[in-house]
Amino acid sequence: MKTELSEVWQQCIDHLERHTSKTAIENWVRSTRPVAVVEDTIIVGVQGEFAKHRMESRYAPLLRQALRDLTKRNMQLKFVANPNVIEDPAAEPVDAPNVADLPAGTSAPAAEQNARLLGYINPKYTFETFVVGNSNRFAHAAALAVAETPARTYNPLFIYGGVGLGKTHLMHAIGHYVLQHNPTAKVAYVSTETFTNEFIMAIQKGSTTAFQNRYRKVDVLLIDDIQFLAGKEATQEEFYHTFNAIREANKQIVISSDRPPKEIPTLEDRLRSRFEWGLICDIQPPDLETRTAILRKKAQSEGIQVPDEVTNYIATNIETNIRELEGALTRVVAYANMLKCPLTYDLAVQALKDILPPVRPKQITIATIKQVVAEHYNIRMQDFEVRNRSRAVAYPRQIAMYLARELTDSSLPKIGEEFGGRDHTTVIHACEKIAKDIQSDPAFAHTIEQLIARIRAE
C-alpha cells in the first residue's frame, strides 16, 4: 500500500543502521529529510554543502540499495543543501511495505503535518528558540499574532531586515505554529527563487494550472526573499494573481525581504501597494545583550557549557549578523573539540583569529578589578584596604587579590601594596584559597568567570 515519503525514508535509515555505525547515522543521516519525489528521484534535504558531499560520497550507494530493498523500485537520490523545495504535483507516491511493518516510533502526527506542508521548514526554527530583544521585538510580536489568528490581524505581514537577522526563523516559526495548532491548515513555505523556477518549469511543461492550484489553495503562504522578484515581469504577474487569490479566500500571506517594499527596484506598483496593505515591520541588528542571549541559547540547545568570557568575546566582536554569530560559536566549539582543550577566552581568540580583527592587548588594572568586585559584592572601594576581618569584606578582598594575580603582571608585593599594604604572604594565601574554592564549587567558579568577563569588558 501507499504510505508517506517520510515514513519510507525513516525505514530506509533504520535499514542502513544495520549496515553502518550508529555514530555515522546520528552525525550525518538522521538529520536528512526527504522533501519531494520527482519521477524516480527522491530529493533529500541536508544541512549544508559539506553534509551534501558526505552523503553523496559515503552513504548514497547504501541508501539506494536500502530503497531498492524496501520499495522494489530502482530509486535515485538527489541531495540538496538547505532546501526550499516544493513538492512536484506530478510526483509519484512511493510503493512501501504494509503500514503494520513500519518501524517503531514513527510519528503519525509528524507525518500528518508533513502532508499539510508544501516546502521545507527547519524544525529548529520555532518561536521557543527565537531570542527576543529590542531589535526584533515588534516583528516577533507581529509574527506570533499572525500565527495565532491567520488572516485576522495583519495580512499581508511584511518583514524586512538585513541578512542573517532572523526573518526566515520567524517565517518558519509561523509555519510550525499553524501546523501544530490548526489540524486542517495547509501551509506553503517557498523562497522567491524557488517560486520563480517552479513557475518557469510549469510553463515549459504546460502545467501552470497545477502550479497555480498548489500555491493558491493554501491557508498560509510564506514567501521568502521577495526582493528577488524585481525585474521578473512574468513571475510578478503570476505572483500578483496568487496574492489576490489568497487574499480573496481570506487566507494569510507572510512576506520577507531585505528591504521595505518602496525600496525594491523594478517592482510593479500594484504589487508594491499590496505589500503595504497589511503590516510592515523591520528587524534591526541585535544589541549586545541580545547577541549574548542568542549565543547562550545556542549553547544551551546544543548541550554545551560555554564560559561567559567566551560568549561575551564573540558577542562584542560580531555585531551585525546572527548567522555569523552562531557560526563563530560553532567554530570555537569545534576548535576546542579538535584540540581536546577547554573552552576559554584565549582559545576563542585563537579560533577566530582569521575572521575577527586581532585583539589589541588591553591593560587590566588592579583598580578596575577592585571596582568590578566591589560592585558585585556591594562593598566600598576603601574596604579593600582597611583591616576588616568580616567575611563580607575579607572574602571579596581575597577574590580581588586572586584576580589581580591572574589578570595583571603585578608582583605579589605590588598587589599587597594595592590592598592596604598587606604582606605578599597574605596575597599568596588569598590566591591559594580562592583557587581551591573554584575547584570545589562550580557555582563559585561560574561567578569568577562572570567577574573576569566584566573586567575584560570594562
Curated annotation (Swiss-Prot):
Record family assignment: Belongs to the DnaA family.
NCBIfam families cross-referenced by the UniProt entry: DnaA (TIGR00362), PRK14086.1 (NF010686)
Keywords, sorted A to Z: ATP-binding, Cytoplasm, DNA replication, DNA-binding, Lipid-binding, Nucleotide-binding
Function summary: Plays an essential role in the initiation and regulation of chromosomal replication. ATP-DnaA binds to the origin of replication (oriC) to initiate formation of the DNA replication initiation complex once per cell cycle. Binds the DnaA box (a 9 base pair repeat at the origin) and separates the double-stranded (ds)DNA. Forms a right-handed helical filament on oriC DNA; dsDNA binds to the exterior of the filament while single-stranded (ss)DNA is stabiized in the filament's interior.
Classification via Gene3D superfamilies: 1.10.1750.10, 1.10.8.60, 3.30.300.180, P-loop containing nucleotide triphosphate hydrolases
Domain of life: Bacteria
Keyword Nucleotide-binding (UniProt): yes
Quaternary context: Oligomerizes as a right-handed, spiral filament on DNA at oriC.
Binding, ATP: G164, G166, K167, T168
InterPro entries found in the cross-reference section: AAA+_ATPase, Chromosome_initiator_DnaA, Chromosome_initiator_DnaA-like, Chromosome_initiator_DnaA_CS, DnaA_C, DnaA_dom, DnaA_N_dom, DnaA_N_sf
Taxonomic source organism: Symbiobacterium thermophilum (strain DSM 24528 / JCM 14929 / IAM 14863 / T)
Subcellular location: Cytoplasm
Any GO BP annotation: DNA replication initiation
Annotated stretches, region: Domain I, interacts with DnaA modulators: 1-93
An annotated Gene Ontology molecular function: lipid binding
Residue numbers spanned by region Domain III, AAA+ region: 120-336
GO cellular component terms listed in the entry, alphabetical order: cytoplasm; plasma membrane
Name of this protein: Chromosomal replication initiator protein DnaA
Record remark: domains: Domain I is involved in oligomerization and binding regulators, domain II is flexibile and of varying length in different bacteria, domain III forms the AAA+ region, while domain IV binds dsDNA.
UniProt region (Domain IV, binds dsDNA), positions on chain: 337-458
Recorded name of the encoding gene: dnaA
Annotated spans, Domain II: 94-119
